[in-house]
């Protein structure tokens, strides 16, 4: 008989659907409660609006990280594991991969325009993010009757493995929920957390697998995808009896120590105008360039630029100066 594993992953910024009315930057109240209520109303209105396209969540998110997430199911076939996929969304809260959602922009990543904590200064950003997640858990969401928190998943499946794959910014938001969920499991060793770059969190350290950029060469892909690629490796290679926090921490801790040091690049920062000129010249030579490929080339040429900044500059030039149909601008 196959063994069920509940997998919780965080959403991605890249999506197949867009909707300007569902961008958190447009809900600028400095009061958390007011902002959340306005956001919730907008989502409910979108659900009732037949002109706004909705898709299953699994098909809304995209990008290299999400491509790996979509391989989780096939990765478990030979191990006779059955997975149930859940998504932590800063916009919709906890949803299943089958939940019908619209395109939206909301995130717990503090550097972005649609950050949950942006513009709210009454308390610390960490507390704001926790409060936002708590508010989302109390909303019915797009699937009536389905779990709206990680704790609710555990209460429904107390004996099953819970694998949480997240970024550090999302770990902070869902931290209280995770601590409560851990205590609700029949065996706390069944909670496994993979959060690249985050080694410890109070009360959860015994559940957190070691994962950082040293795994990149072994797992392949971008460094930022190490957490989902490690999850894929575990799902495809480990027998169900070995998927518990204690065994995996020991095994992958030793494996991580065997990896070469993280490569350091001595790349040069240049002014924004020079970055734009670089993008412009390359697009003039090749109109089929994607932002992803051009950023890779830019870095290979010895220059440094954060992904989101480069993408924004790329899209700005694309829209204003070239009016080109760029095939792929996701990272």
List the predicted regions and their residue ranges.
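A glycine-rich, hydrophobic loop/mini-helix early in the fold
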Residues: 38-108, 115
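Short, flexible loop segments at boundaries between secondary-structure elements
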Residues: 186-221
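A structured, charge-rich N-terminal accessory region that forms the first stable segment of a protein
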Residues: 1-59
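DNA-recognition alpha helix
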Residues: 291-303
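Long, charge-dense
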Residues: 91-149
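Positively charged, polyanion-binding regions of nucleic-acid-associated proteins
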Residues: 268-289, 301, 314-326
């Amino acid at each position: 008989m196959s063994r069920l594993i509940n997998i919780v992953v965080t959403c991605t910024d890249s999506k197949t659907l867009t909707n300007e009315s569902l961008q958190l930057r447009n809900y600028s109240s400095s009061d958390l409660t007011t902002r959340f209520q306005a956001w919730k109303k907008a989502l409910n209105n979108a659900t009732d609006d037949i002109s706004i396209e909705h898709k299953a969540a699994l098909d809304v998110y995209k990008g290299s990280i999400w491509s790996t997430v979509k391989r989780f199911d096939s990765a478990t076939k030979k191990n006779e594991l059955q997975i149930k996929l859940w998504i932590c969304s800063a916009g919709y809260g906890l949803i299943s991969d089958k939940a019908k959602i619209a395109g939206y922009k909301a995130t717990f990543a503090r550097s972005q325009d649609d950050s949950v904590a942006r513009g709210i200064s009454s308390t610390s950003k960490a507390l704001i993010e926790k409060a936002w997640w708590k508010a989302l858990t109390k909303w019915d969401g797009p699937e009536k009757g389905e779990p709206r928190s990680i704790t609710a998943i555990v209460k429904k499946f107390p004996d099953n493995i819970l694998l949480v794959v997240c970024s550090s910014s999302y770990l902070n938001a869902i931290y209280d929920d995770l601590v409560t969920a851990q205590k609700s499991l029949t065996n706390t060793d069944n909670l496994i957390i993979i959060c690249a770059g985050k080694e410890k969190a109070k009360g959860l350290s015994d559940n957190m697998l070691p994962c950082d950029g040293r795994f990149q060469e072994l797992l392949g892909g971008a460094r930022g995808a190490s957490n989902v690629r490690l999850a894929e490796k575990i799902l495809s290679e480990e027998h169900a009896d070995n998927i518990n926090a204690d065994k995996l921490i020991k095994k992958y801790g030793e494996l991580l120590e065997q990896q070469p040091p993280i490569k350091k690049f001595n790349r040069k920062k240049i002014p924004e105008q020079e970055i734009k000129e670089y993008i412009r010249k390359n697009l003039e030579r090749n109109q089929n360039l994607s932002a992803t490929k051009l950023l890779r080339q830019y870095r290979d040429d010895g220059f440094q630029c954060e992904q989101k900044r480069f993408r924004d500059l790329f899209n700005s030039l694309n829209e204003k100066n070239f009016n080109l149909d760029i095939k792929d601008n996701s990272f």
